[in-house]
Amino acid sequence: MIPEKRIIRRIQSGGCAIHCQDCSISQLCIPFTLNEHELDQLDNIIERKKPIQKGQTLFKAGDELKSLYAIRSGTIKSYTITEQGDEQITGFHLAGDLVGFDAIGSGHHPSFAQALETSMVCEIPFETLDDLSGKMPNLRQQMMRLMSGEIKGDQDMILLLSKKNAEERLAAFIYNLSCRFAQRGFSPREFRLTMTRGDIGNYLGLTVETISRLLGRFQKSGMLAVKGKYITIENNDALAQLAGHTRNVA
């Protein structure tokens, strides 16, 4: 039986709200490891925002840190602007990811966050979340795990750019996307790229022409099937090996 206070809260927040207890990607997000009472406390501080349209920003570089954002659906890219005025993409965030961690140190966002497609996010006021985490060890531990994952991702990206050639970079990018889709319950073999080839090239330090040429080469070799933005992994072993992994795609 659903407690009365939870029913009231759901009615007040509108029919489009999905609460932590019901969210299909909660195991990737803050609610993971929290008990029902802790989930209720977390649920009370979260604001379910209306859809973020393609091209809209969650925050801009220099903005004060007020909230973290948990992605419920869609894709968000983070980027900075170089001294020369060029965009430099620093990450692609999928459902279950939290955006805004890099602002905790200074209290201001060092980067921009922009929707690549219509996306749904949960806004989590940081000061309230920080206060709650001081009272709830499980929440604090989960926050540490999520931040650790962010650091590991940054380290992997540094290794990717410093050690791998163009083929290996793109293979690693596609392999990583495949694994992330699998974690979210989607097909790891067939998926749509929500980012442009220009975005992928920017992120990997490659030109658009190089990305297109490599995708054609991967398709010709039988490793991938490429149709517009749709990717089908035809040879898991070859992709994993080129990406520097020995484990097959799940």
UniProtKB/Swiss-Prot annotation:
Location of the region described as Activating region 3B in the Swiss-Prot/TrEMBL record: 81
Domain HTH crp-type residues, every copy: 164-237
Positions of region (Activating region 3A): 60-61
Cofactor(s) needed: [4Fe-4S] cluster
Stretch list, region Dimerization: 140-159
Pfam families the record matches: cNMP_binding, HTH_Crp_2
Localisation: Cytoplasm
Annotated region described as Activating region 2B, given as residue ranges: 123-124
Regions recorded as binding DNA: 197-216
GO molecular function list: 4 iron, 4 sulfur cluster binding; DNA binding; DNA-binding transcription factor activity; metal ion binding
Assembly mode: Homodimer.
Protein name, UniProt field: Fumarate and nitrate reduction regulatory protein
Lineage: Bacteria, Pseudomonadati, Pseudomonadota, Gammaproteobacteria, Enterobacterales
